[in-house]
Amino acid sequence: MNTAVNVNVVHESEAQRQFARVKLPARIRYIGANREGVDARLLDLSAGGFAFTASGAPIQPGDLYKGKLLFQVDSISFSLEVEFQVRSVDPASRRVGCEFQNLKPREVAALRYLITSYLAGEVIGVGDMLNTLQRENFTKARKQGGGNGGMGFFGRVRAVTLSTAIFVVGVGAFAFILNQMYNLYFVTHADSGVVSVPNQQITMPREGTVQSLLGPNAEVAKGAPIATFSANLLDMLKGNLTEEQLNPGNIEKLFGHQMKGTLTSPCDCRVVQQLVADGQYANKGQVIFTLAPRDSVASIEARFPYRNAAELAPGTRVNFQVAGDGVNRSGRIVNTAPVDGDLSSEIRVQIQPDQPLDAQYAGRPAEVSIGGLPGRTLLNKAVTLATAR
């Protein structure tokens, strides 16, 4: 086997193999131990040191000197100021091996550029040398957290806590986005929903003022009074009096008299809503109270877009939540019909809850949806809690 050998490349010891020594045309100038000037040609050069043949000047291993390395490039000479220490001296050949000391990054970059270009066979140019000296050739050292080169106990706890918090926030944000996308593309939502209870309305028999005898959500038996009203006698007789009876004296007497009456309950009911405040004037026929029978069962009435008609078959499972209840409930569709008979508008859906719904929720809005994966209730609660905070 024929192996090509480059005689210009000499390797140092195994421990120093990272520094390739090359024979560059360069010289070293320094002041000797006796203050005499020494100028010698380099035998070889590496990024870690150099070697030269010493003259008759005394030199010993361990001596420390300051000098200049002189290079000739494109008929231009330039020098590098270096500090070096004598590491070995061969008495027979007077070969002196030296090691660089306290080299700055610029000097190291220049030496590496010269050696690399020489080994690659490239022409060394002044412009390339200037570019090498101007750019940043070394990475900065990493910052140490402490004097011992590592973090302490509290530093580790803080780092783990911060990492865990960032991880939890990231998982929560991902779950929130996933839940929103699922609700948007895979869940059908009603445009509106309300808790509906069979009710009866109490209207004003005469023009006048109303005074309630019961509080909100109060229960009342059939025939029991629920409110009193007072009407002006003149307003009641208006249109029934002749011109002779409408003299100023009679008008003054009638104007000062009030007729009082009582509004009674038509069933064993509960007061769902009072539509006219106490002492407020009401017209004849105006609804005063909305009553719901005690044994009535509340249901949900919702409106869906007509494009979702295929999903609104009777028996379809739905999910809903009543405002102010905070509980996710389920039910099924029992009846569907177009709103006001108009096929181009919305579809009215009546929903029967799986669990009895308190009639006190009558009139409250409800959020109704069709579809959903198992466990969405827990996910919705978690998302609601996170957004509330």
Swiss-Prot record:
Residues 16-116 form the PilZ domain. Its EC number is 2.4.1.33. GO terms for cellular component: Gram-negative-bacterium-type cell wall; periplasmic space; plasma membrane. GO terms for molecular function: alginate synthase activity; bile acid transmembrane transporter activity; cyclic-di-GMP binding; long-chain fatty acid-CoA ligase activity. One of its GO terms (biological process) is bile acid and bile salt transport. It is found in: Periplasm. Disulfide bonds: none annotated. It catalyses: [(1->4)-beta-D-mannuronosyl](n) + GDP-alpha-D-mannuronate = [(1->4)-beta-D-mannuronosyl](n+1) + GDP + H(+). InterPro entries: MFP, PilZ_domain. Pathway: Glycan biosynthesis; alginate biosynthesis. Keywords: Alginate biosynthesis, Glycosyltransferase, Periplasm, Transferase. Its main location: periplasm. It comes from the Bacteria. PANTHER family: MEMBRANE FUSION SUBUNIT OF EMRAB-TOLC MULTIDRUG EFFLUX PUMP, MULTIDRUG EXPORT PROTEIN EMRA-RELATED. Belongs to the Alg44 family. Required for alginate biosynthesis. This is Mannuronan synthase. It comes from Pseudomonas aeruginosa (strain ATCC 15692 / DSM 22644 / CIP 104116 / JCM 14847 / LMG 12228 / 1C / PRS 101 / PAO1). The gene is alg44.
